[in-house]
Swiss-Prot record:
It is an enzyme of class 3 (hydrolase). Pfam families: Abhydrolase_3. Its main location: cytoplasm. The active site is at residues 165, 262, 292. InterPro entries: AB_hydrolase_3 (IPR013094), AB_hydrolase_fold (IPR029058), Acetyl_esterase (IPR023508), GDXG_lipolytic_enzyme (IPR050300), Lipase_GDXG_put_SER_AS (IPR033140). NCBIfam families: PRK10162.1. This is Acetyl esterase. Keywords: Cytoplasm, Hydrolase, Serine esterase. It comes from Salmonella newport (strain SL254). A motif (Involved in the stabilization of the negatively charged intermediate by the formation of the oxyanion hole) lies at residues 91-93. Its EC number is 3.1.1.-. Homodimer. Interacts with MalT and MelA. Displays esterase activity towards short chain fatty esters (acyl chain length of up to 8 carbons). Able to hydrolyze triacetylglycerol (triacetin) and tributyrylglycerol (tributyrin), but not trioleylglycerol (triolein) or cholesterol oleate. Negatively regulates MalT activity by antagonizing maltotriose binding. Inhibits MelA galactosidase activity.
């Protein structure tokens, strides 16, 4: 699409979102567009430090979990000594960026608002690790903690998955993988999905939105996909293009959150409409005036905190509902 035909989203953002876009961190160098992947990962970690500051304090524990691909680092956030459920978190970053530190504040707030133990999974990044490794690592982590629950004071009778952006895809894909492969790790009571991508190759929102401000141009999205997938055939896999999976039955309740000016918003809309059409429990909420990745900015955006609390409320309600 000709760039001039795109919607000028920067003029339509909320005041909070504009403040974030215009905020300059002192001493932060520009994004290393021409740097290699390791340089970009280090920059992303540095840039996110400000946004992760002043997070709630709570007991945390790091654990290396054995998987078929080697040990995967996890971090357990325990807001209280006992927990009614366990929530696994998959971070975003286009499959190529991010770790437990870049999303630390999000996980701490989610633990605080749910009152549950949140386990962040530092899955292997692409292109070094290709589909479906991150999903299989996530499943291995769930299996490990289901077998060692007493050792970590976990309640794994009720579990959930949560994630933002690429992590949202991994969260839903992992839950479907457990269902499809008949792997028992606990009763999946809910999945919390913030502005994920779920398999669309093109859409109205992907044409109208996306630019240098969010790193989600068509070229960017193609790059993330090529880094993650092994080959072109993987695009149609039911655990990548989740719309090719069976969404008509036994899908855990989904909280589906989107950002108004996100190129990926149509993925969330289609997911919601598909689940709703087949009477699968779900809730959809769009956060006006926001860009993709707004969940990171709760230090400056009350709506980011609202989005986390909305997901937490959804999860807590499912803790009380027999399934």
């Amino acid at each position: 699409m000709k760039p001039e035909n795109k919607i000028p989203v920067l003029t339509r953002l909320s005041d909070e979102m504009k403040a974030v876009v215009n905020f300059q961190q002192p001493g932060l160098p520009p994004w290393p567009a021409d740097g290699d992947i390791e340089t970009q990962r280090q920059y992303y970690l540095l840039e996110r430090r400000f946004w992760n500051a002043d997070a709630p304090s709570m007991t945390t524990r790091t654990c290396a979990v054995p998987t078929p691909y080697g040990d995967v680092t996890t971090r357990l956030y325990s807001p209280q000594p006992t927990s009614q459920a366990t929530l696994y978190y998959l971070h975003g970053g286009g499959f190529i960026l991010g770790n437990l530190d870049t999303h630390d504040r999000i996980m701490r707030l989610l633990a605080r608002y749910t009152g549950c133990t949140v386990i962040g999974i530092d899955y292997s990044l692409s292109p070094q690790a290709r589909y479906p490794q991150a999903i299989e690592e996530t499943v291995a982590v769930c299996s490990y903690f289901s077998q060692h629950a007493d050792e970590y004071s976990l309640n794994v009778e009720k579990i959930g998955f949560a994630g933002d952006s690429a992590g949202a895809m991994l969260a839903l894909a992992s839950a479907l993988w457990l269902r499809d492969k008949h792997i028992r790790c606990g009763n999946v009571i809910a999945i919390l999905l913030w502005y994920g991508l779920y398999g669309l190759q093109d859409s109205v929102s992907r044409r109208l939105f996306g630019g240098a401000w969010d790193g989600l141009t068509r070229e960017d999205l193609d790059m993330y996909e090529k880094a993650y997938l092994r080959n072109d055939e993987d695009r149609e896999s039911p655990w990548y293009c989740l719309f090719n999976n069976d969404l008509t039955r036994d899908v855990p309740p989904c909280f589906i959150a989107s950002a108004e000016f996100d190129p990926l918003i149509d993925d969330s809309r289609l997911l919601h409409q598909t689940l709703q059409a087949h009477q699968q429990p779900c809730e959809y909420k769009m956060y006006p005036g926001t860009l993709h990745a707004f969940l990171h900015y709760s230090r400056m955006m009350t709506i980011a905190d609202d989005a986390l609390q909305d997901g937490a409320r959804f999860f807590m309600a499912r803790m009380k509902t027999p399934r």
